[in-house]
Amino acid sequence: LIALLKQQKNIDARGIELSQKGVSLAVSKGIAVVQGDADADLFHYPDKGFDFVVLSQTIQATRRPEIVLRELLRIGRHAIVSFPNFGFWRMRAHLLLKGEMPVTEDLPYTWYDSPNIHFCTIRDFFDLCAQADARIDKFVALGGGRRPLPDSWPLAVKNVIGEQAVFLLSQKDGD
């Protein structure tokens, strides 16, 4: 996501990545990345030091999602958070019909070796945002082929049909 934003919007982008392999891959693509842990290292960054902070496909793998979300909004004026929707109908059907956790293109790990420790639906993330005093400025559910689902569709439908979710957030108090 950072590479896409850098390419299309010509932004000054920097990242934090847990794995050394991920750091090496990002650096090879010209993205400034340091190795770090969102659960432990965000407190090092200054208040409102960034216009936008991006947490892409990671919140479900953090130990303390609410604290991480609050830290994102402390260090950035806005946060962009994306994650796989565990409420997606195919995942529900797989669990119901096969009785086992699904392994998909977006979630390529078995349950016992997955970095995902908090299985989150789109509806769950709305609740987390309320708990963390995060204002949802924009929300997009992505369906097949990463196409945005229509804004007019109800949240309940997006929670079942959306494979991924992307949120643009800011602090409720406007800080």
Describe the function of each predicted region.
Residues L1-D41:
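Class I SAM-dependent methyltransferase SAM/SAH-binding core
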Residues K9, L72-I75:
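Catalytic cores of nucleotide-enabled group-transfer and carboxylate-activating enzymes in metabolic
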Residues D12, G49-D51:
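Structural signature of beta-strand start/N-cap positions in the alpha/beta core
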Residues I31-V34, D51-V54, L96-E100, L155-A156:
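Short, hinge-like loop/turn segments at secondary-structure boundaries
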Residues D41-D47, R63:
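Short conserved loop adjoining the S-adenosyl-L-methionine
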Residues K48-G49, I75:
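Alpha-helix C-terminal capping/helix-to-coil transition sites in glycosyltransferase folds
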Residues D51-R64, F83:
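A short SAM/SAH-binding and catalytic strip from SAM-dependent methyltransferases
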Residues I67-E71, H78-G174:
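S-adenosyl-L-methionine-dependent methyltransferase catalytic module, highlighting the catalytic core
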